[in-house]
């Protein structure tokens, strides 16, 4: 699709300042000493880790995370040395063993259940490697992690020392990188309802180098709601990547009919988003009257926002 190529070009522009190749390798006759280190990924209290007899699983609020990306960086030079993309089918999911060179490392981890996650290089080209295989980096390097649709996502970094007498196991606690947006409809969905269109500025990628969220663009989330016809009090939930400091954006909600006409198009200005918090926009979206409400208040965190419209 054309939008796919436009998004790749957009990401390339976002990543223009990131080098697309690794530092030149130096030839040495010395044999590199290595050690096997077990990495255990867990998360904040809202996230649980289970260990069935078959394999480990990592879940958030009862929903399993599907992909884990582990980046092994040389702490001194910042060079990416190795990468492991684990899918939920891996027998050691969230608990892999890594072969690491002696020395100082920075390990960065992203765990997600976003739809179709993929790595991109600095030009916006998809960067591929074998799933569930620890891959040595050479040539072009991955610069960003993106997805076709953002869902619950976590990340963290940890410095690791590898050598004689150092720990053979490292635990990394992951923190949420997203906010949740809830559209809480207070009216009854009409018989001819078709789609909900949510338009907002959102971040589309995560930088591999420092796990910051990057590439903000205007995006549409289109949800098919025809199955809700005749029902009342139905809410829809979305996830958005959020910078550490949070951000605000206008959110436009458009309700459409099967005839191709609009019931309403409502813009809520300056909607706040913060990591690990839920923003709720509550009101009537088909027979709109005054009294919208926006809020951030959720079991994820003690604080939140609510906006009534």
Where are these regions (language model features)?
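Tryptophan-paired
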Residues: 57-124, 190-277, 296-298, 302-309
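Intrinsic-disorder/low-complexity, polar/charged segments enriched in Ser/Thr/Lys/Arg/Asp/Glu/Gln
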Residues: 34-36, 93-95, 167-169, 180, ...
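Bacterial Sec-dependent N-terminal signal peptides
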Residues: 2-5, 15-47, 183, 276, ...
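Residues within well-ordered beta-strands of beta-sheet-rich folds
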Residues: 108-110, 180-184
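Structural motif
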Residues: 25, 40-62, 184-192
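Short, surface-exposed loop/turn motifs at beta-strand boundaries within globular domains
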Residues: 32, 63, 102, 174-178
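Extracellular beta-sheet/turn segments enriched in Thr/Pro/Gly and aliphatic residues
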Residues: 132-177, 184-186, 266-309
């Amino acid at each position: 699709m054309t939008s796919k190529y436009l998004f790749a070009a957009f990401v390339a522009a976002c990543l223009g300042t990131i080098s697309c190749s690794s530092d030149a390798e130096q030839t040495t006759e010395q044999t590199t000493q290595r050690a096997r280190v077990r990495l255990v990924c867990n998360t904040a209290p809202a996230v649980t880790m289970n260990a069935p007899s078959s394999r480990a699983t990592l879940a958030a609020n009862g929903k399993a995370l599907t992909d884990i990306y582990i980046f092994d960086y040389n702490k001194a030079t910042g060079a990416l040395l190795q990468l492991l993309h684990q899918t939920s089918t891996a027998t050691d999911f969230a608990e892999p063993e890594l072969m690491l060179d002696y020395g100082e490392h920075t390990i960065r981890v992203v765990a997600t259940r976003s739809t179709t996650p993929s790595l991109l290089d600095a030009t916006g080209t998809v960067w591929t490697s074998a799933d569930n295989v620890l891959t040595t980096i050479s040539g072009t390097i991955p610069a960003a992690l993106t997805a076709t649709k953002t869902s619950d996502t976590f990340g963290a970094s940890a410095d690791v020392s590898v050598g004689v007498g150092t720990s053979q196991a490292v635990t990394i606690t992951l923190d949420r990188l997203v906010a949740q947006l809830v559209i809480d409809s207070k009216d009854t969905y009409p018989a001819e309802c078709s789609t909900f269109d949510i338009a907002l500025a959102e971040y589309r990628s995560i930088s591999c180098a420092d796990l910051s969220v990057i590439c903000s663009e205007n995006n549409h989330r289109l949800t098919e709601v025809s199955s809700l016809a005749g029902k009342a009090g139905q809410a829809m939930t979305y996830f958005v990547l959020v910078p550490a400091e949070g951000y605000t954006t206008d959110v436009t909600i458009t309700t459409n009919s099967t005839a191709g006409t609009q019931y309403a198009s409502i813009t809520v200005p300056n909607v706040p988003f913060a990591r690990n918090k839920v923003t709720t926009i509550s009101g009537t979206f088909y027979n709109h009257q005054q009294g919208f409400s926006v809020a951030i208040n959720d079991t994820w965190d003690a604080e939140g926002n609510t906006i009534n419209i």
